[in-house]
Amino acid sequence: YLYQTLGFPAPYPDPQENKREVCELNPDCDELADHIGFQEAYRRFYGTA
């Protein structure tokens, strides 16, 4: 895709985005992520990030 107004390619999708969304849907994981960061919060709730 191209940004319509800027004329350059869109950035590559974040490979962690799916895991970030899973963590955001869990209120406890989301709250912990606010304090210690997404990757560490995800690891504590779901295993390896």
Swiss-Prot record:
Sites of Hydroxyproline modification: P9
Keywords: Biomineralization, Calcium, Disulfide bond, Gamma-carboxyglutamic acid, Hormone, Hydroxylation, Metal-binding, Secreted
Modified residues (4-carboxyglutamate): E17, E21, E24
Keyword Disulfide bond annotated: yes
Record PTM text: Gamma-carboxyglutamate residues are formed by vitamin K dependent carboxylation by GGCX. These residues are essential for the binding of calcium. Decarboxylation promotes the hormone activity.
Binding site for Ca(2+) 1: E17
BP term (GO), one: cognition
Positions of disulphide bridges: C23-C29
Major subcellular location class: secreted
Described function: The carboxylated form is one of the main organic components of the bone matrix, which constitutes 1-2% of the total bone protein: it acts as a negative regulator of bone formation and is required to limit bone formation without impairing bone resorption or mineralization. The carboxylated form binds strongly to apatite and calcium.
Family: Belongs to the osteocalcin/matrix Gla protein family.
Name by which UniProt lists this protein: Osteocalcin
Provenance organism: Notamacropus eugenii (Tammar wallaby)
The organism's taxonomic lineage, starting at the top: Eukaryota, Metazoa, Chordata, Craniata, Vertebrata
